[in-house]
Amino acid sequence: MHDSDKYFMKCAIFLAKISEMIGEVPVGAVLVFNNTIIGKGLNSSILNHDPTAHAEIKALRNGAKFLKNYRLLHTTLYVTLEPCIMCYGAIIHSRISRLVFGAKYKNLQKYICCKNHFFINKNFRKISITQEVLESECSNLLSSFFKRKRKIATKYFNNNII
């Protein structure tokens, strides 16, 4: 873990909290180049009616616009939740150097077919991965969000509103 990992993860957590305020799953991401944030993203799939509007994808898109290049060499992506398969694909193709995430994505194990999350050619460039940075803060944000959602759903279901 690098000295700056906690700082940049806290920036991603801030974005995740904004995502939650707009009714989205609280996930935030920042893309960093030379210790500077060049891309930010928060989940907005529901708001934008876009299944690809994940925090990671948005941070990568913003970073690519900033660098004027889709190849995001020598960058680090910080994200509050381990990326899904779609986001892993975008991360691999963007050629970032490093991925840092907070909470583990427990459902990902259902979909991975190869060791170490790499389901592509072994000769492809590898990405350094640092896991569970500020894990409890990231996990708590997600669990409290889903507890509230379940409580609301149960209330409506039990009162025959749905």
UniProtKB/Swiss-Prot annotation:
Reported cofactor(s): Zn(2+)
**Looking at the keywords, is Transcription regulation present?**
no
Sorted keywords for this record are: Hydrolase, Metal-binding, tRNA processing, Zinc
Q: What is its EC number?
A: 3.5.4.33
Family per UniProt? Answer: Belongs to the cytidine and deoxycytidylate deaminase family.
Which residues does the annotation say bind Zn(2+)? H54, C84, C87
Q: GO: which molecular function terms?
A: tRNA-specific adenosine-34 deaminase activity; zinc ion binding
Task: Write out the catalysed reaction.
Answer: adenosine(34) in tRNA + H2O + H(+) = inosine(34) in tRNA + NH4(+)
Tell me, how does this one assemble?
A: Homodimer.
UniProt xrefs under InterPro entries: APOBEC/CMP_deaminase_Zn-bd, CMP_dCMP_dom, Cytidine_deaminase-like, tRNA_aden_deaminase
Q: Which PROSITE patterns match?
A: CYT_DCMP_DEAMINASES_1, CYT_DCMP_DEAMINASES_2
The UniProt record lists the CMP/dCMP-type deaminase domain at 3-115
Q: Which Gene3D superfamilies match?
A: Cytidine Deaminase, domain 2
Entry note: cofactor? Binds 1 zinc ion per subunit.
| BP GO terms, sorted | tRNA wobble adenosine to inosine editing
Designated name of the protein? tRNA-specific adenosine deaminase
| PANTHER family referenced in this protein's UniProt entry, alphabetically | CYTOSINE DEAMINASE FAMILY MEMBER (PTHR11079), TRNA-SPECIFIC ADENOSINE DEAMINASE (PTHR11079:SF202)
Function recorded in the entry: Catalyzes the deamination of adenosine to inosine at the wobble position 34 of tRNA(Arg2).
* Entry annotated with the keyword Metal-binding: yes
What is annotated as the active site?
A: E56
